[in-house]
Amino acid sequence: MNSIWARLRLASSQLPIGGYSYSQGLEAALDNGWVRDAESARTWLVDQLQLNLARFEAPLLAGLLRAALVGDWAACDAASERHRASRETRELAHESRQMGFSLRQLLEALPELDAPGRAWLARQDPPNLAAAWAMAARAWRLDAEEALSAWFWNWLENQLAVLMKTLPLGQLAAQKLASSLLPELDRACAEALRRPAVEGSAAFGLALASMTHETQYSRLFRS
């Protein structure tokens, strides 16, 4: 089977894991005035890509993906625990747990994931999103680059949806923003695949946005 179908499936915003419920701090950045228009939105997203995702989140996921594909369950355990420990706020931790749980439910209801993958995923209580994403890649026979590119696109599509609902950003403007960010996605994905998973980074602005969102008076999203 052509792997493009599995990659599109994993990257789709229609994947029933609840990603539309979360803004990952972007709604707080809008409320605080850090993001005001398409230009400042692009700055925020590029910073997230370059300073957080490409340097820590994605390399960690890439390591977990590689371990999952070859069945190195000890390495999977270590990477999953590191991902869990790196959630800096209650909202970000809850987001990862909820989406991971939903993706595990989906994989348990479908036939593709093999017995070793099912057994490992069942031991994660609860699973985080990175752990479940890695098992989806194993189930649908995606390599690390394919599964990671699906993850990057899923993230970008979600962020654009948040902007269209809250900035507000029109559909055409959102597509223009997406076009300008595609080279950044390429660079971030390539850097993540090169970086060792043991390296790290810190995105203090994201953590602060997430913390302030917990007490934000009016909000549409859960993070």
What are these model-derived regions, one by one?
Residues 1-223:
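Metal- and O2-centered redox machinery and metal/ROS homeostasis
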